[in-house]
Amino acid sequence: MTDLSQVPSPYDESKFVTFDGSPFQLYQPYPPAGDQPEAIRQLVEGIGDGLSYQTLLGVTGSGKTYTMANVIAQAGRPAIVFAPNKTLAAQLYSEFREFFPRNAVEYFVSYYDYYQPEAYVPQRDLFIEKDSSVNEHIEQMRLSATKSLLERRDVVIVATVSAIYGIGNPTEYHQMILTLRTGDKISQRDVIARLIAMQYTRNETDFQRGTFRVRGDTVDIFPAEHAEMAVRLELFDDEVDSLQLFDPLTGRVRQKILRFTVYPSSHYVTPRETVLRAIGTIKAELRERLDFFYQENKLVEAQRLEQRTRFDLEMLQELGFCKGIENYSRHLSGAQPGEPPPTLVDYLPSDALMFLDESHVLIGQLNGMYNGDRARKETLSAYGFRLPSALDNRPLKFAEFEGKMRQVVFVSATPADYEKQRAGDEVVEQVVRPTGLVDPIIHVRPATTQVDDLLSEIHERVKAGERVLVTTLTKRMAEQLTEFLSENGVKVRYLHSDIDTVERVEIIRDLRLGTFDVLVGINLLREGLDIPEVSLVAILDADKEGFLRAERSLIQTIGRAARNVNGTAILYGDRITESMKKAIGETERRRAKQIAHNEAHGITPRGVVKRIKDIIDGVYNVDDARAELKAAQDAAKYEDMSEKQVGKEIKRLEKQMLDHAKNLEFEKAAAVRDQLAKLKSQVFGASGEDHIVPAA
């Protein structure tokens, strides 16, 4: 038997740091540098002083995630970090896992691979049935997140706006848990009854997440929130004799434990008495709504509503759940009309910290979720597809989210008006990079001669072995410029939205390798192009006010040259607009601060060195080359797959793994499991390991 505590650690023990009164163990591969120590000190001080809002203004490449990790560790309180999309959330999750390998770092994003909400189009009399595909891997990680919040204090949750959508009531969810301790008096029948109430399924042949099996006085439970760990409960004379964690694939016992808590298999599990109470209130609302339709002479709507609702009531009565049960969430939670639904935010303790990463994007997202959802549901209610109470199954309004905010730190290189209003003067700057790199020098030149001037600048950079990014306003302009530069002997490529992910990676690789020297694009700041070899960013028609030439967009685009020692940005325009003035002023201010810091500490800026070998298919060893090429081909294949195809591929691998296990081919099963983990990690950005809480 392997005791998990005896497994050797891949980390250097001397680099773990702890703080008084904090449950976190922070792994510091390097000490904070540049502006990081001061930013950490100010943020921790502000949190200690009870400040509701602070802003961390961190430039590209300044190590904002590392600063957040240090602040969380020193404050010693649970934290939630919001990200604007799944990709960034996965990146943050991966980084926080590196900094907190011994604490619970969790991932809470939408668990739908595909989601088509139910909707009605009155103009065409078209009803669209709800259709969705739930990703089991992400569902397991969501359950793991709420479990960690209920069990421990050393928790960091990385979430997207999915966290403001309704999930089960925390109080009722907590009431349903089953805690097992060695020596507890409980019969086998009681254990089975409790598991079935928590929506676990008995399955003697196909043992998977959310199921249990019974063999005499031994009950094996595969907890819904675990990916690779099940628990074996051995009873003797109606008493818990022993508890063991084991690998459900190989059956090998991993660890003996004294206590284990089994959580419900879904966030929407509800006690039987609550369901019966809800049935009564749903019937009352149905009668009221039918009376309204009859008075309005809307007989079709009345018949439709009665048929659909009575079918759902029958299912609730017999099974305890029905399709679309979330539309009755107000009745199940006992909330009043218009009350906000329970969300992940309600699972957070009152002293939790909130970090809003890329807050200038995130605030807009949080603001927009409620209105779109409501418009769709009002139509469903008006035409008799749903009861009016379905409108309360919704995301939080922004004002409601604000009311639930804990102490907040906005994190952005370009904070917007909302952050400025809320945080006011409480802005902590992280402008100085640990590498000593400074923001680019900015030149403003006339737009009338922009193409000729750009051509001469490109020739200078090419001679020095450096690369150039050029951003234009329109697709047509980008195509014409690419053609002109090519005719004048410049090795140039054009990056646009029609290029798929794999080709885009190849283009960036070729730019870094020097296969070509100039990359032309329209909205390069969105592409996330952090290429150290780029020493010049040219912004054509910078004086045309608009989304692509707004202050924040200009600052982000200029920042593309911030990873090179010779970084320069040229803004072509016949006048200096207000946005240009602000962007230049802010960049100059940051640059002056960075240079002063370097001079005071004798730091020589050093460029960011990213190994290009990461991209070149193994040149040293033929076998390695073949393996890397196959991995790259698999990765490219997965990138090109639709979400439905990815779901099918995961199911295929899972079936293959279980077939090997049934045939006692455990090495093959483990190999397929590793392949499955790689696929999940690539597609969802997280592999989902189990967090085991040591028995007290």
UniProtKB/Swiss-Prot annotation:
**GO biological process assignments:** nucleotide-excision repair; SOS response
Query: Residues in domain Helicase ATP-binding?
Result: 45-434
The short motif Beta-hairpin is annotated over 111-134
Q: Give all residue intervals belonging to the Helicase C-terminal domain.
A: 450-616
What residues bind ATP, as annotated? 58-65
Q: Which InterPro entries match?
A: Helicase/UvrB_N, Helicase_ATP-bd, Helicase_C-like, P-loop_NTPase, UVR_dom, UVR_dom_sf, UvrB, UvrB_inter
Q: Where in the cell is it found?
A: Cytoplasm
* Signal peptide start and end residues: none
Q: What is known of its domains?
A: The beta-hairpin motif is involved in DNA binding.
According to its UniProt entry, the function of this protein is described as: The UvrABC repair system catalyzes the recognition and processing of DNA lesions. A damage recognition complex composed of 2 UvrA and 2 UvrB subunits scans DNA for abnormalities. Upon binding of the UvrA(2)B(2) complex to a putative damaged site, the DNA wraps around one UvrB monomer. DNA wrap is dependent on ATP binding by UvrB and probably causes local melting of the DNA helix, facilitating insertion of UvrB beta-hairpin between the DNA strands. Then UvrB probes one DNA strand for the presence of a lesion.
Q: What is the protein name given in its UniProt record? A: UvrABC system protein B
Q: Which organism is it from?
A: Ralstonia nicotianae (strain ATCC BAA-1114 / GMI1000)
The lineage, from the top, is:
Bacteria, Pseudomonadati, Pseudomonadota, Betaproteobacteria, Burkholderiales
